[in-house]
C-alpha cells in the first residue's frame, strides 16, 4: 500500500512515521483477520520503496480444504482489503498490489505426545546435518522472532562446525514467556 491510515504515536522513530509494530494481533470479532505483519519494520531492506510504501502481510487462520482456504485468490484479496478498510487501517485507493499465499500447516497442531519430545530431540540430534528450526521444525509454538533465532543459531553452528544443537533447541524455553493453561 502507499500508506496506512495508522500513524506512529510513540517516541520510536520509524521510516515514514508508520506504526512501529512488526505485527499487530487483531482482536476485532467483526473480521476474520488474525494478524497484520508490517514488513517495513522487520527491515527496510525487505521493501522495495520503504520511504513511500508499506508492505503488509495478513494472516488468516483456516484449515486446508475449508471455505476460506478454497476461496479464489481474487475473491480472497478483495475480502482482505475490505477488512482492512472496515478496520480503518487503509483506504482502497492506497492499495498498489496484492498476492495470496496459502501456507500448509503454518501452525503446528499440539496433540498428545509431548511427553516424548526429549526422546525425539535426542534421536534427531544424532543426525549431524539435520537442524530443526522454526515452528514446524521444532513442533513448538515459536513466534517469528523465536523462529528466526533458531535459524540464526543454526547458521552459527554450521559455520563453527559444532554438532551440539542445544543452543537451537533452547530458543524460546524461558518459562516466564509461555502462557499457562488455567
Task: Please tell me what each predicted stretch does.
Residues 1-74, 78-88, 123, 166-176:
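Mid-domain catalytic core of redox enzymes
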Residues 18-20, 31-45, 93-130:
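FAD/FMN-dependent oxidoreductases across multiple families
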Residues 63-65, 105-106, 137-139:
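Short Gly/Pro-enriched loop/turn and capping motifs at secondary-structure junctions
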Residues 76-94, 144-161:
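A short, terminal or domain-edge coil/loop segment
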Residues 101, 111-182:
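C-terminal lid/capping helical subdomain adjacent to the catalytic/cofactor pocket in oxidative enzymes
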Amino acid at each position: 500500500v502507499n500508506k496506512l491510515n495508522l500513524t506512529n504515536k510513540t517516541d520510536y522513530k520509524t521510516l515514514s512515521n508508520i506504526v512501529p509494530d512488526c505485527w499487530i494481533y487483531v482482536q476485532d470479532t467483526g473480521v476474520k483477520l488474525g494478524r497484520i505483519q508490517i514488513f517495513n519494520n522487520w527491515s527496510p531492506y525487505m521493501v522495495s520503496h520503504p520511504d513511500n510504501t508499506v508492505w503488509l502481510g495478513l494472516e488468516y487462520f483456516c484449515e486446508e480444504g475449508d471455505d476460506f482456504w478454497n476461496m479464489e485468490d481474487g475473491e480472497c484479496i478483495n475480502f482482505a482489503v475490505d477488512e482492512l478498510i472496515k478496520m480503518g487501517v487503509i483506504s482502497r485507493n492506497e492499495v498498489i498490489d496484492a498476492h495470496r499465499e496459502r501456507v500448509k500447516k503454518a501452525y503446528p497442531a499440539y496433540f498428545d505426545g509431548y511427553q516424548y519430545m526429549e526422546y525425539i530431540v535426542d534421536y534427531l540430534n544424532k543426525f549431524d546435518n539435520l537442524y530443526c528450526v522454526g515452528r514446524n521444525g521444532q513442533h513448538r509454538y515459536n513466534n517469528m522472532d523465536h523462529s528466526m533465532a533458531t535459524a540464526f543459531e543454526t547458521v552459527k553452528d554450521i559455520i563453527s562446525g559444532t554438532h551440539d544443537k542445544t543452543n537451537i533447541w533452547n530458543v524460546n524455553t524461558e518459562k516466564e514467556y509461555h502462557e499457562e493453561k488455567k
